[in-house]
Swiss-Prot record:
Taxonomic superkingdom: Eukaryota
Family statement: Belongs to the KRTAP type 6 family.
Assigned keywords, A-Z: Keratin, Repeat
Keyword Repeat belongs to the record: yes
Protein name, as recorded: Keratin-associated protein 6-3
Coiled coil region boundaries: none
Length: 110
């Protein structure tokens, strides 16, 4: 994926080599997943939120503790106390204004 627009996951083309996952923040679609974000965070087989639904992780919209995607603990934004995510505001914590979180060595912070 070479698109530089912000998708539901905040996917940027830099994520492909920036440590955010295979195929620019998603193995099978727009979601964060399989190669770097971790399939425990944003899924790996659809629009990319959760194990098979439209939510990050397995707690709710933006959750996913232990993720590499920096998904927020609660809500549709990134947050502290969740994987590499610290402070940012995007749907899934990948790309726009997030990267993998503030002060993280696993990606970028936009």
């Amino acid at each position: 994926m070479t698109s530089t627009t912000n998708t539901m996951c905040g996917s940027y083309y830099r994520n492909y080599n920036g440590g955010h996952g295979y195929g620019c923040c998603g193995y099978g679609g727009l979601g964060c997943g399989y190669g770097g974000c971790g399939y425990g965070c944003c899924g790996y087989g659809g629009l990319g939120f959760g194990y098979g639904g439209l939510d990050c992780g397995y707690g709710g919209l933006g959750c996913g503790y232990g993720s590499f995607c920096g998904c927020g603990y609660r809500g549709l934004d990134c947050g502290y106390g969740c994987g590499y995510g610290y402070v940012s505001h995007s749907f899934c914590g990948c790309g726009y204004r997030c990267g993998s979180g503030y002060g993280s060595s696993f990606g970028y912070y936009y």
